[in-house]
A protein has these predicted regions:
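Hydrophobic "anchor" residues on beta-strands that sit immediately upstream
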Residues: 152, 225-227, 249
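Short amphipathic alpha-helical "interface-anchor" segments enriched in bulky aromatics
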Residues: 38, 86, 328-359, 364-365
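Structural motif
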Residues: 58-67, 307, 357-366
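Dynamic "connector" segments at or just before major functional cores
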Residues: 1-201, 206-221, 243-246
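Acidic/histidine-rich, metal-coordinating catalytic segments
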Residues: 156, 225-235
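Alpha-helical scaffolding segments of alpha/beta enzyme cores, especially the outer helices
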Residues: 210, 214, 238-241, 245, ...
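Flexible loop/turn segments at secondary-structure boundaries
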Residues: 95-96, 160-162, 191-193, 201-202, ...
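An anionic, glycine-rich sequence signature occurring as long contiguous blocks
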Residues: 3-17, 21, 249-347
Length: 366
């Protein structure tokens, strides 16, 4: 065992080289410094001070809220999704650099402090609402740089498995697991504009109004033309009516039924002759009114015949778009990109790490 080395060891053969034995001065997360620069240019710190309220008093305020929120967010960006990771990251050079002067001097927050911040301070109603406003305003700052006049909103739900008997977790027959079932809204650029954590056993469209309608109102106040896409879980007349009242165009997958298939009977006849190696695709647009609808709406059908398959693949889309049928289908199919954004959230920033017992604490983490 050698003596403890507190100072860098200088090599005799080359004075420009030094060996440092202090692990606290080594980091593998230097890329976060560039994220911190983006954070500064977008005014993230100002938004935190504007929208979050600090309930602490006295010595408990030694670490500013901005430092705590940055540590929480940056930890996830670097792959440290567990609050327990804060213990070893508190002296990491990168996590000390991204904070205020106090963090550089003292080190970042330890696990107990960061856990209290996430599950108690941010869970307060005012701060929880503030997190939503911070997210919305950050995206607005980016949109202001290169903002198209038309915004496409994609809504979808997903499964987040739970870790035990957590509040409001429940078995979902569709996913065949005990889970939470959040609802999310994305734009074409992959920004998650709005979200809501929900119990595991609710319908995919449950609570759509409180997630979607405020986002539509926000976008229209910015002078944007809003277009909406969603899968068949959102094929509900109340959704069509709400969108039409607000002048929002939409393309929503419609579940097949006998009435719809009778309207396209001529498309379902297999082409005569030897089957083509390439799919044979047919389109048709027509007016259709279900019993639960107050009026008829345009429906676009797509029928595909594939080599080696006995029956055609049939899909229906209810839409208020005025483009031709092929363009409607092509536009709707881009909705699948939203599923990739969800995968990115699960795999890249670990949004599935909702391991707190309390439902509100998990809402904060999401």
């Amino acid at each position: 065992m050698g003596d403890k080395q507190n100072q860098p060891f200088q090599l005799s053969f080359n004075a420009s080289l030094k060996i440092d034995f202090q692990g606290s001065r080594v980091t593998s997360d230097g890329g976060l410094i560039l994220v911190r620069e983006l954070d500064e240019r977008l005014g993230f710190g100002d938004l935190i001070r504007q929208h979050l309220t600090d309930p602490r008093r006295g010595k408990n305020t030694q670490l500013p809220l901005a430092d705590l929120l940055r540590q929480s967010v940056y930890g996830r960006l670097a792959g440290y999704e567990d609050v327990n990771d804060a213990e070893r990251l508190s002296q990491d050079p990168t996590f000390r650099l991204i904070g205020s002067a106090k963090i550089w001097e003292r080190g970042a927050a330890l696990t107990s402090r960061l856990q209290s911040f996430e599950t108690e301070m941010l869970a307060e109603e005012q701060n929880f609402a503030g997190l939503t406003r911070i997210n919305r305003e950050l995206i607005a700052k980016v949109e202001a740089i290169d903002s198209p006049r038309r915004v496409v909103l994609d809504m979808d739900s997903t499964e987040i498995p739970v870790y035990g008997q957590q509040e409001q977790s429940a078995y979902n027959g569709h996913f065949e697991s005990t889970c939470y079932h959040p609802l999310l809204v994305f734009n074409r650029e992959g920004d998650c504009l709005a979200g809501k954590l929900r119990p595991g056993n609710v319908h995919s469209a449950d609570g759509w109004e409180e997630v979607l309608l405020p986002e539509i109102e926000w976008q229209q106040k910015q002078g944007k033309q809003v277009v909406f896409r969603a899968d068949a879980a959102f094929a509900k007349p109340e959704i069509y009516e709400a969108l039409e009242e607000r002048g929002v165009k939409y393309a929503i997958r419609l579940p097949a039924n006998d009435c719809l298939e009778r309207d396209i009977a001529e498309l379902l006849t297999r082409p005569v002759g030897r089957p083509s190696h390439k799919p044979v695709v047919r389109y048709k647009g027509f007016l259709y009114q279900a019993e639960s609808w107050k009026k008829a709406r345009r429906v676009v059908a797509k029928v595909e015949f594939h080599a080696g398959e006995l029956f055609p693949r049939v899909g229906f889309i209810v839409t208020s778009l005025d483009t031709d049928s092929r363009a409607v289908v092509r536009f709707y199919n881009k909705r699948g990109t939203a599923e990739q954004w969800i995968k990115e959230g699960k795999q890249a920033v670990k949004m599935t790490r909702l391991s707190c017992h309390r439902f509100r604490a998990n809402e904060v983490r999401l």
